Amino acid sequence: EVGALLADWLLRRGVRGTYAASLVSGSLMHALATAHGVRTAETPTGFKWIVRAGTDADPLVYGYEEALGYAVAPDVVRDKDGISAALAVALLAAELKASGRTLTDRLDELAREHGLFATGQLSVRVEDLALIADAMARLRAAPPAALLGRPVEPADLAEADPPVDAVRLLGDRVRVIVRPSGTDPKLKAYLETVVP
């Protein structure tokens, strides 16, 4: 939620440009930026991709990923920067406190305005890495047609530009991304549903 709160804070301050997040991050930031008429970008995981998401017309002004990395001043630091992010959160919290509100209050307001974006992650650790490759191959060969009773469109992100070893299942108010961990012997599923 910190990623969305920081995006909201910048958007309300009139900061325009590209707002980027890794594909496994929640999509509330994209909804907020779209509501403000601002360009968004979805990138592979890692800040090397996020900091490249801007264009000449719409330079990157904010980026984050669910693994707790934030770029709130990418024109100054072209990487995740916990110091500037902590300062931005402190400024946001102070502004909210001055009006008798908290960060949680602002999240509640955003949920009422844009829907509740509920996210979670499941991980399966394995001893044999071949099990992960096999699971990804089976998912690509026979993706589910529905989740939570809602139809979903599968997308093999290995065919994206740049290619990503992941499968996305996207439907009305539901999104699942399955991918191997880049650091551990795990298969990860990133889950999101939006409650209007």
Where are these regions (language model features)?
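Phosphate-binding and adjacent anionic-ligand microenvironments
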Residues: 5, 13-182, 186-190, 196
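Basic, amphipathic juxtamembrane/active-site segments
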Residues: 1-8
